[in-house]
Amino acid sequence: SGYVIKFTNGLTVYLSGDTGIHTEMKSVVGDFHKANLVLLNYGSSAISAYSATYAMNELIKPSAVIATHVNERATTSGKLRPESRTAALVKMQKRPVHLAISGRTMEFDGKANCVAGCN
C-alpha cells in the first residue's frame, strides 16, 4: 500500500512503506496520482534490485527516487559503496536515485528535481 502526499508546488510523493511490489503501483500511484518522487523502502530481502527497478521503471515511472531503509551499509562518508545492493539498484534505474543520508536535508521542486541537499 504506502502513502501518497501532494504538495502545493506540484510535487507528488509516494512513500512505499514496507510494502512489496504490487500492480496497484501502476494504476493508483503511477497513473492516477502521477507520483513524481518515490521514497522507496529498499531494505526488505523480499525486494530485490530487479523487482524495485521494475516497479520504478515500468509501473510508477517517477522523475526521481530516494532509496531509504536499505538495511545495509550502503554508504561510507556519504558516498555510495559500489558493492552494495543499493549500488545495484542505482545502476538499473532510468532516473536519478538519491541516497537518504543521516543529517542531510533534501529539497525538491514540483517536478521532483532536487534543488538542494543531493549529490
Short names for language-model regions:
Residues 29, 54-119:
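Binuclear metal-ion centers of metallo-dependent hydrolases, dominated by the metallo-beta-lactamase
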Residues 17-19, 42-44, 70:
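Active-site metal-binding loops of divalent metal-dependent hydrolases
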Residues 31-39, 43:
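Active-site metal-binding motif and surrounding structural segment of the metallo-beta-lactamase
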Residues 1-30, 102-119:
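Core dinuclear metal-dependent hydrolase active-site scaffold
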Residues 11-13, 37, 64:
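Structural motif
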Residues 14-15, 40, 67, 99:
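Structural beta-sheet core signal
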Residues 43-49, 74-77:
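Acidic-and-aromatic substrate-binding clefts and catalytic sites of carbohydrate-active enzymes
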